[in-house]
Amino acid sequence: MKTMCYFRNHFLIAMPALDDVNFARTVTFICEHNQDGAMGIIINRPLSITLDQMLQHIKVKDCPQEVGEMPVFLGGPIQQERGFVLHRPIGQWETTLRVGDEVGITTSRDILDAITQGKGPPQTLIALGYAGWGPNQLEQELAENAWLSTPANSTVVFDTPYQQRWEAAAALAGVDLSRLSGEIGHA
């Protein structure tokens, strides 16, 4: 009997040879993975809009300047009009999925209202869109060496500057990406 290995609460780190415009040099935080597929949020691709600009589109007003200047990330190529909030601590929100011991992902508006009122989680990453894989698709891409996987670390998500997250996530797996070849092979 074959036992499946799921990657919930893991980072997917794009290998240097991955040249897909949606995923080159990305770190994707896997929020859900089961027999039906996988879903994650890219954590190192900021968009050219701030939280304040995004909130104006959904009619949330009175955003304090320090909150409004937060970057919004491109979470992935699927449903880019849909918002996702990765946060620590998990807290109690209408639609929160616990990803690990420290991190939740929420899609309900109540968390945005709380953030703008200074009552939200102290650490957040706000994204539009998500990355998704169908049944066995992610496993196939891993077998093809498109990705490096390692258990996620919330410090990389919330405390590491986004420009350094690709290298920092790989370092968790003991990999220096600058030393990898762009050639793909199997031993």
Curated annotation (Swiss-Prot):
Please give one Pfam family short name: DUF179
What superkingdom does the record give? Bacteria
Per the record, its GO cellular-component terms are: cytosol
Which segments of the protein form a coiled coil according to its record?
none
Q: Cross-referenced Gene3D superfamilies, in alphabetical order? A: VC0467-like
Report the sequence similarity comment from the record.
Answer: Belongs to the UPF0301 (AlgH) family.
Task: Return the HAMAP family for the record.
Answer: UPF0301 (MF_00758)
Q: What name does the UniProt record give this protein?
A: UPF0301 protein Noc_0368
Q: Which organism is it from?
A: Nitrosococcus oceani (strain ATCC 19707 / BCRC 17464 / JCM 30415 / NCIMB 11848 / C-107)
